[in-house]
Amino acid sequence: MLFPIVIGRIYNLEIIFVRHGESEANVLELMYGSSDYLLTSRGKSQAKKAGEILRGMNYEPIAIYVSSLTRTHETLTHMGYAVEEAKKDQRLDERHLGDLEGLDYRVLHKEQPHLFKEWNENWLEYKPGGGETHVAFQMRIRSFLKDLEKNHTKEDRVLVVCHGGTMKTIFAEIFQHHENYFFNLEVYNCSLMRFKQGQKGLVLDALYNIDDWCTGEEESWTSKS
């Protein structure tokens, strides 16, 4: 059983998961997962603010994990951490959407609604051409979580920078109610999820939406009072 969630009073191991900042593909509303896109200026500002939040918590990770994709590397850099010191793990990559990668979501939904109907009716096993099923995606995330549990002690602080779908799957895996939690959790750009080890398992300690901490234009965000 992975990471049972309980209410506990003694906290030791801490893990913070962060989604990458806004990417070019997010702005264009493209279907993408494994494709590599850069951060926008807004995404860089979001990452900078996420880093400030962690430093405000005096959060000093002894281990950092990051996916293999550029947008997470950029996010980590703008958060103030060295990518070279992070452990790059492809299991954290977003789901591979195969032939759907790079297509305009709005156009696709209008011109080929049957694709979304098929996807919704069999969402776990639906496989875009050349892509992967959600089950395959879920299994590699589960593998990462098992290794994370095995490789870290109760005294460790860990930072993981990854993707929206990855974080939703992690959340659902930890809570062991996959479908309900996957579809009912919104993970915005640079959202932070913090888990702490309680007496019997991991406790969801905090969930931050970075936009709630910022105001103003992309290049001049300030903390809200």
Label every model-predicted segment.
Residues 15, 19-74, 128-142:
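Loop-to-helix element that buttresses phosphate recognition and phosphoryl-transfer chemistry
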Residues 164-169, 191:
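GST superfamily/GST-like fold recognition
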Residues 15, 62, 156-162:
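Generic beta-sheet signal
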Residues 27-30, 115-126:
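Short, basic/glycine-rich phosphate-binding loops at helix/coil junctions
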Residues 78, 169, 173:
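Active-site signature of alpha/beta-hydrolase-fold catalytic machinery across serine-
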Residues 18-21, 161-166:
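Histidine-centered catalytic micro-motifs
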Residues 2-12, 89, 95-109, 150, ...:
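Acidic, low-complexity terminal tails and accessory targeting/binding regions
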